[in-house]
A protein has these predicted regions:
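Bacterial carbohydrate/catabolite-sensing allosteric modules
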Residues: 1, 10, 42, 83-88, ...
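N-terminal helix-turn-helix DNA-binding module of bacterial transcription factors
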Residues: 1-60, 330
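Short beta-strand segments enriched in small/hydrophobic residues
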Residues: 17-20, 54-70, 169, 177-184
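Amphipathic helical "hinge" segments at domain boundaries
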Residues: 45-110, 114-117, 195-198, 202, ...
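Short hydrophobic/charged patches on amphipathic alpha-helices used for structural packing
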Residues: 51, 105-108, 132, 167, ...
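Short beta->alpha connector loops
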Residues: 98-101, 122-127, 245-246
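Acidic, Gly/Pro-rich loop/turn segments at junctions of secondary structure
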Residues: 118-130, 142-151
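Catalytic-core regions built around general acid/base machinery
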Residues: 129-137
């Protein structure tokens, strides 16, 4: 894709001078204007008018596509992104992808046809290669999940390290049989967290029973039912590592309703009621506000200067918040 820097090189001027020509700066000489116009024609370059309007302070719109706005993690992230962009005079078009991969392409392409100035997206499918032609003309940043089949800019959290810390924490409190509950491996966050779980199980010499790994469906309620079945079986798990917030909420409710108050649990992702429950829920905090803020920064860099080098991969640290549920000792046999 031809950029402003390419035009500057062919015209023999700086990128700043090219920008001044685009913005009709009266202090640029006619000779310089002609050289820039000649270079544009030679390279078949069309100025990014959306970026121009953004710099001029005009209203522009950014698309934000997430799996589920009801998920507390994505809800907090969405609020952060909206506040940040609207404070800069930019509207935000929010859409939900759901958890079915077939819906993702339809929703994103419908959004991109609206000629938005940029897109922030947390994908749900296993292949984003269909976005390649769109990315040529619309800046994109991938959030929470790295794109697959496409080279793109993405901002994620340390899923691997967070899962390792969660399981290690349970191991330090005496647990040997730790169950993993998550969603489909189609989601890259689940894949990385499962790898972190397995790494910690091996490192701490825990029981590597395959029956302790459960990914029944996208439904947290089904995960809760499967957990209760495992707790009723011989040699049940004494602790649970939950892969995401909806799953954690369903598992905690099921444990309470079934009277399994001695089962330890650590969830990946914080949520509003986590500290108010009894016992309060130990979590791996993902910092959704920080993720959203950096995603906005990366997107604005790409909008302002499409040819600029932007850091492609950003991984934010996570932190364990001990509150009680992850510190319960194993129940006596």
């Amino acid at each position: 894709m031809t950029t402003m820097r390419d035009v500057a090189r062919v015209a023999g001027v700086s990128a700043k001078t090219v920008s001044r020509v685009f913005n009709e700066d009266p202090h640029v000489t006619e000779e310089t204007r002609d050289r820039v116009r000649w270079a544009m024609q030679k390279l078949n370059y069309v100025p990014n008018l959306l970026a121009k309007s953004f710099r001029a302070g005009a209203d522009t719109a950014v698309g934000l596509a997430i799996p589920d706005i009801a998920d507390p993690f994505f809800a907090e992230m969405t609020s952060s992104i909206e506040t940040d962009l609207m404070g800069r005079g930019m509207a935000v078009v929010v859409t939900s992808l759901g958890h079915g991969p077939d819906r993702e392409r339809y929703v994103l392409e419908a959004l991109l046809r609206r000629q938005i100035s940029g897109l922030i997206v947390a994908c749900v499918s296993t292949d984003q290669s269909y976005l390649a032609p769109w990315q040529e003309r619309t800046p994109m940043v991938f959030l929470d999940r790295a794109p697959r089949g496409l080279a793109g800019v993405f901002v994620i959290e340390d899923d691997l390290g967070g899962a390792r810390e969660a399981v290690a924490h349970l191991a330090r409190h005496g647990h040997r049989r730790v169950a993993f509950f998550g969603v489909s491996l189609r989601v890259t966050t689940t894949d990385r967290r499962l790898k972190g779980y397995r790494s910690a199980v091996a490192e701490h010499g825990l029981d590597a029973d395959p029956e302790l790994i459960c990914m029944p469906s996208e439904s947290p309620e089904v995960a809760a039912d499967e957990m209760l079945k495992r707790l009723a079986a011989p040699n049940p798990p004494t602790a649970v590592f939950s892969c995401n917030v909806p799953c954690t909420m369903a598992l905690v409710l099921a444990l309470h309703q079934a009277g399994h108050n001695g089962v330890a649990i650590v969830g990946f992702g914080d949520f509003p009621m986590a500290a108010a429950l009894s016992p309060a829920v130990t979590v791996i905090d993902q910092d959704p506000i920080g993720l959203g803020r950096i995603a906005v920064e990366r997107l604005l860099q790409r909008i302002e200067d499409p040819g600029a080098q932007v850091r492609r991969r950003t991984v934010l640290p996570v932190s364990l918040i001990p509150r009680g549920s992850g510190e319960l000792p194993p129940a006596a046999p």
